[in-house]
Amino acid sequence: MEAENGEVAALVEKITGLHAAISKLPALSPSPQVDALFTELVAACVPSSPVDVTKLGPEAQEMRQDLIRLCSAAEGLLEAHYSDMLTALDSPLDHLGRFPYFDNYVNLSKLEHDLLAGHVAAPARVAFIGSGPLPFSSLFLATYHLPDTRFDNYDRCSVANGRAMKLVGAADEGVRSRMAFHTAEVTDLTAELGAYDVVFLAALVGMTSKEKADAIAHLGKHMADGAVLVREALHGARAFLYPVVELDDVGRGGFQVLAVHHPAGDEVFNSFIVARKVKMSA
């Protein structure tokens, strides 16, 4: 226990130092300095760790909340930068590997498909909420794993959707004809949610645990009975980068948890939860 406490203390000290350095940056747009600091931060958070972020002291909790905000802003700028860079190239889909976390998305889409296959037989319609300017998850599922499925991508930012549409426009007709983009907040979606067999909720939808719980409850109110929710989540030290999703919140939202996947190595960064919408009793 003493060794475990020492490991947690050392991790918190390192992340606190990185937070201080990131906070002093003049901007969060991609640059050698920004890239180096966030690469170091991700490397510190990837290894398995005994840390439970819910048990951190008030000062560390305040640091973590601000770090989550900084990571969200930096991730949005990073994705916008690479979306613009890729679409400026001839045959942009041939150069997706330039994105620093490309391999993570390739591996993640395979894992998501493999887990879904045990619970959903060939979904006809899938929604991605929080798809962003680089809709890699839906693009890779549409291209490699679900060739007959239609994908609706939702993001609250119309500029992000414009970038995504431009990128997906370079895909084969058989892929791009099955990919649609809509500008909306998750809470704006009501009746349309009932049409989907699967709904993916991205890690950046909801910047606090309460916002995430509220989003899940909203989906539980409007998704069809038997439909499946896939929620990106974080575990261990990775929870310094995104808010934690509590399984109790998934259950209270009207879902039965079917599977929880936590990555064993560094091939995939995100954990995710697979849950089925249950019929609400009268």
From Swiss-Prot:
Alphabetical GO biological process terms: nicotianamine biosynthetic process
GO molecular function, one term: nicotianamine synthase activity
InterPro entries assigned: Nicotian_synth (IPR004298), SAM-dependent_MTases_sf (IPR029063)
Record-linked Pfam families: NAS
PROSITE patterns reported in the protein's UniProt record: NAS
Protein family membership: Belongs to the nicotianamine synthase (NAS)-like family.
Note: Homologous to nicotianamine synthase, but without enzymatic activity.
Protein's recorded name: Nicotianamine synthase-like 5 protein
Organism encoding this protein: Hordeum vulgare (Barley)
Gene name per UniProt: NAS5
